[in-house]
Amino acid sequence: MLRSEKPVAVEDIVNIYKESPSIIITHYHGLTVSQVSSLRESLKSKEAGFKVVKNTLAKIAANQTGLDSIANLFAGPTAIVYSKEPVEMAKLVVNFAKANDNLKIIGGIVDNHVLDEHSIKELSKLPALNELRGKIVGLLQAPATKVVGVLQAPSSSMARVIQAHASKN
């Protein structure tokens, strides 16, 4: 890389760090071009990205954005995976790493919290934000649907329930 290209490359990485609250740092040594392309396509479908970075430039960008805590993770053949949705990204990367031994998860950062490999794997086991929202809505709607079901029962059924209660007393 030419010296004149380095500031532009650092600026690109700085923009990724600023726009993406979730970053996973990986080693990609041994992945084929088709494997990297496959990973990029699956990440793109989840609005995430994969970028191979030079370690010195990634460290400079980390220092410029206040992410000094991850600067020590940049060693070896490094690529960053970035997204605004940490759980979906973690699931994709962890599953890809299971299927391809050549992708190694080193660590990452989510909302300014540094994560190690184990934490990223645990993060991938959580339900995504949209799944949680769906579950909460379902839980909130369940009691209302039961009441509606009882009220919509045929009047003869309601009369039998009232008659049974009256005869019981």
Curated annotation (Swiss-Prot):
CDD domains: Ribosomal_L10
Keyword Ribonucleoprotein: yes
Coiled-coil regions listed: none
Homology family: Belongs to the universal ribosomal protein uL10 family.
The protein's role, per its UniProt record: Forms part of the ribosomal stalk, playing a central role in the interaction of the ribosome with GTP-bound translation factors.
UniProt keyword terms in alphabetical order: Ribonucleoprotein, Ribosomal protein, RNA-binding, rRNA-binding
UniProt name for this protein: Large ribosomal subunit protein uL10
The protein's assembly and partners: Part of the ribosomal stalk of the 50S ribosomal subunit. The N-terminus interacts with L11 and the large rRNA to form the base of the stalk. The C-terminus forms an elongated spine to which L12 dimers bind in a sequential fashion forming a multimeric L10(L12)X complex.
Disulfide links within the chain: none
Any single Gene Ontology cellular-component annotation: large ribosomal subunit
